[in-house]
């Protein structure tokens, strides 16, 4: 059993913001697989099979800074080990259009990942970072991540979400090393 959690903030005003890259990727994956989300574990949950294994998709509805609670609740209930958890989230340190898959690591200043580390009690879970780039001079970081993608960024976003879907699917079916070799370029 595996868990793929996409981080974001609930509510229409945040729906297409940079900070919701994790939600956006899971929405695209669920649409591709024709899955519906239902409320459970302080989040929205869908389930599917990948590579002969049950995989849960989770969009925590706790707001970003408390995302780990929802992830922990689902993981504990289904007895999913941290090594079988993938968290998808936005990363300002990567330029828009880049992905980076990691098997562990620090929060790197991301509050949703800080919460997940605290709730799981370990840094040893998979993460897929979706690059959103850094704000230009004069932009506050908090305002930047809560802003929508620009018209110019949308084609790049669409392409990277498609790549991200392929990366998490490969991770679920064949493991992280193969996915890292293919998508960390």
From Swiss-Prot:
Q: Which purpose does this protein serve, as stated in its record?
A: Hydrolyzes ribosome-free peptidyl-tRNAs (with 1 or more amino acids incorporated), which drop off the ribosome during protein synthesis, or as a result of ribosome stalling.
Give the active-site positions. 19
Q: Which EC numbers characterise this protein's activity in its record?
A: 3.1.1.29
The positions annotated as site (Discriminates between blocked and unblocked aminoacyl-tRNA) read 9
Which processes are annotated in GO (biological process)?
protein quality control for misfolded or incompletely synthesized proteins; rescue of stalled ribosome
Please state what the protein is called. Peptidyl-tRNA hydrolase
Record-stated family: Belongs to the PTH family.
Acyltransferase as UniProt keyword: no
Tell me how this protein assembles: Monomer.
A Gene Ontology term for the protein's cellular component = cytoplasm
Which gene carries the instructions for this protein?
A: pth
The species this protein was found in: Desulfitobacterium hafniense (strain Y51)
């Amino acid at each position: 059993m595996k868990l793929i959690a996409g981080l974001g903030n609930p509510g229409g005003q945040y729906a297409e913001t940079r900070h919701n890259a994790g939600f956006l990727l899971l929405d695209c994956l669920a649409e591709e697989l024709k899955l519906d989300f239902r409320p459970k574990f302080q989040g929205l949950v869908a389930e599917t099979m990948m590579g002969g294994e049950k995989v849960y998709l989770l969009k925590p509805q706790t707001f970003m800074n408390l995302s780990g609670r929802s992830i922990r609740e689902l993981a504990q209930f289904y007895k999913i080990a941290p090594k079988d958890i993938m968290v998808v989230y936005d990363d300002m340190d990567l330029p828009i259009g880049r992905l980076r898959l990691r098997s562990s690591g620090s929060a790197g200043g991301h509050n949703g990942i800080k919460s997940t580390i605290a709730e799981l009690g370990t840094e040893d879970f998979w993460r897929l970072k979706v690059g959103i780039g850094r704000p230009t001079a004069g932009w506050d970081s908090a305002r930047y991540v809560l802003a929508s993608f620009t018209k110019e960024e949308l084609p790049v976003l669409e392409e990277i979400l498609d790549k991200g879907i392929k990366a998490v699917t490969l991770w679920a079916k064949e493991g992280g090393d193969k996915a890292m070799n293919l998508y960390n370029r």
